[in-house]
Design a protein with these regions (language model features):
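Sequence signature of WD/YWTD-type beta-propeller architectures
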Residues: 2-128
Length: 128
């Protein structure tokens, strides 16, 4: 395109997307964290038996995927998230995938530690 004797090029940049999945240990369920654009995360439930996906909730913030765990049967997700805004700033929570609504919530306040893992369906170990 030419504008007033100058060559002008439009540069289109596609945002990068990162995917991270956690598989349930005793069922055909997984959760997929779709991160991007920027500070947005989408939670997706994946039925690996029939390869179907259920879109869930978006979070404007950050989920630290490597500090998350799925219950052995895939019914519950333990996650560590942050938006670094008051009042919580960061927190660990348990939800039912593909949603992030907290069934249990532990405020953290910073980015050190956080999250945890399932020892069984009804027992967790927090990293607070």
């Amino acid at each position: 395109m030419t504008h007033a004797g100058h060559n002008t090029f439009m540069k289109t940049t596609l945002g990068s997307v990162r995917l991270y999945a956690i598989l349930a240990r005793k069922s055909a369920v997984a959760v997929v964290f779709r991160r991007g654009p920027s500070r947005n995360v989408l939670l997706i439930k994946w039925n690996t038996a029939d390869d179907t996906f259920e879109l869930g909730q978006w979070l404007r913030g950050r989920i630290y995927e490597r500090r998350c765990d799925l219950s052995p049967d895939g019914d519950l997700l333990l996650y560590f998230a942050a938006n670094y805004r008051a009042p919580l700033r960061s927190w660990s929570a348990i939800s039912r995938p593909p949603f992030l609504k907290a069934l249990a919530l532990w405020p953290k306040g910073d980015g050190w530690g956080g999250g945890g893992h399932f020892q069984s369906h009804s027992r967790i170990a927090l990293s607070h």
